[in-house]
Amino acid sequence: MLRKIILFLVFLQFIGYQVFSQVSVKDSAIVVPMIYATYAYQLPGGDLAKRFGGNSSIGGGFMIKTRSNWLFAAEGNYIFGSNIKNGDSLLKNISTPDGYVINANGYYSEIGFGETGFDVLGKFGKLFPVLSPNPNSGPLIMIGGGFLQDKIRIHDGDNTAPEVHGDYKKGYDRLNNGWILSGTVGYLYLSDSRLINFFVGFEFMQSWTKYRRARNFDTGLHDNSSLSSQFYGAKVKWFIPLYKRKPKDFYLY
């Protein structure tokens, strides 16, 4: 699957280079619409840090850079991780004294835990063309806001433990969602050749979420408390510019 994604991105990059190769970013600041893929490694803070360790996120988005180097973007990310704190205690009420869950065949189940979620954000900011090879590259700063959802992923390796399937699983996953704000600083590089276009930087996110399940099965209680959490991440993006053109003439904004 990963190989197919990489090949697809390389194909799009090649097509973009062939179709739009007469547009130059080295002479002046131009309007640059771009699609991109992104990866981040994040460390949690606040309430979610009590449950999860570091996680990763992969996603994509669309960004447009104006001639005056203002930036506007829409982005979505899938969040995943395997670092769960005290995960085994969630199933204590359906486990043996040794901490195992008995499956439908009478054997021990291989239950695993992880983190899964997603975020969707709108962002805007400014690029500063200093310490850069052309007027369309340089340090940038962006802020944004959107929606975040996060929960515990419970995986039954043999798929034979009905205690953690379907609606029963929902009683243990601590689903929470709500609003999120983000701030990003880093460096955007758009090459003169149009083949290498990337961003590297750091992102901070502050979320305000709320538990959404009717009842937690491990406690037997309804929990509608709110969470205040942070994410501190290192982020990279790979861009594919989409310059406009006419049949014979290319626009230089």
Tell what function each PLM region has.
Residues 31, 54-58, 114-120, 137, ...:
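Residues that define the transmembrane beta-barrel architecture of outer-membrane proteins
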Residues 4-14:
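Sec-dependent N-terminal signal peptides
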Residues 183, 189-253:
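Predominantly the C-terminal beta-signal and adjacent terminal strand-loop region
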Residues 22-31, 68-69, 130-138, 190-198, ...:
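Short loop/turn motifs that connect adjacent beta-strands in outer-membrane beta-barrel proteins
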Residues 46-51, 84-116, 150-178, 209-233:
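Extracellular/periplasm-exposed beta-strand and loop segments of Gram-negative cell-envelope proteins
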Residues 37, 60-64, 76, 120-126, ...:
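Residues on the lipid-exposed face of transmembrane beta-strands in outer-membrane beta-barrel proteins
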